[in-house]
Amino acid sequence: MKKLISIVLLFSFISFAFAQNATVKGVVKFSGEAPKPRLISMKADRQCDAIHGGKQVQAEDVVVNQNGTLKWVFVYVKEGVKGKYNPPSEPVVLDQQGCWYHPHVFGIMVGQKLEVRNSDPLLHNIHATPKKNKPFNIGQPVKGMKSYHTFDTPEIMVPFKCDVHPWMSAYAGVLDHPFYSVTNDKGEFEIKNLPPGTYTIEAWHERLGTQTQTVTVKAGEVKTIEFTFERKK
C-alpha cells in the first residue's frame, strides 16, 4: 500500500511539474513572391531515376508552403536554458529512401543515437561534415543496412551529403537540451516543456539565414511568436 501511494505521489509531482512548464509555438512566414521550385533530375543514376519514374524531384532547400509559410526551418532555444538534460534512449532515424534523405532537417541531442538507414536497393554513403564534431563517411551498399552515430558537442547545423548522389542533403541541429522543433508543411513549430524564464529563440534556414527573438514565459503559459524570412537579394 505504501509503495502504491509513493507511486501515485511521484506521478502527481511529475504531472504538476509539467503543468508548470511553458510552450512557445508559432509559424515561420515567407515574405514576397515565392521562388519557383528547384527541380532535380536523377538521370545520373538509372536506379534512382527509375524509382521516381523518370520524373524530376523538387529540392527541399527552399520550400514555401501553400499558406505562404516555410517548411524545414529549425527553431530552437539558443540561450537561456539552465541545468542538464539527459538524451532520450530512442534514436533519431535518418533514412535514405528514393535516393533522398528523410527527414531533410532534424534535431538531435548530444549523446543521443542517430540511426542511419538505407531503404534503397543500391549504394549510398552517409557523409557528415560537422565543424565541431567528428566527421564520418560510411558506405551502405545493401538495402536494410543501419549504422549508429552520436555527437559529442552542440552544433548548429551538421550537414549530411551522399558522395554517390550529390543532390542528397540533410541537416542536423545538435543540442544539449530538448527544446527545438522543425517547421512542418504549414510552417508551424512548437517547443514544449520550457521552464519559466527568458530565452533567445533562433530560427535557422539553410538558404535564408537566421533570425532571433527574445521571449519570456511564465509557468503554464503558451506564447505564440512569428518569424518572417524574405528572399535574399
What positions do the PLM features span?
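Sec-dependent N-terminal signal peptides
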Residues: L4-I14
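N-terminal, intrinsically disordered, basic low-complexity segments enriched in Arg/Pro/Ser/Thr
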Residues: F16-F18
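Extracytoplasmic copper-binding redox domains, predominantly the cupredoxin/blue-copper superfamily
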Residues: Q20-K233
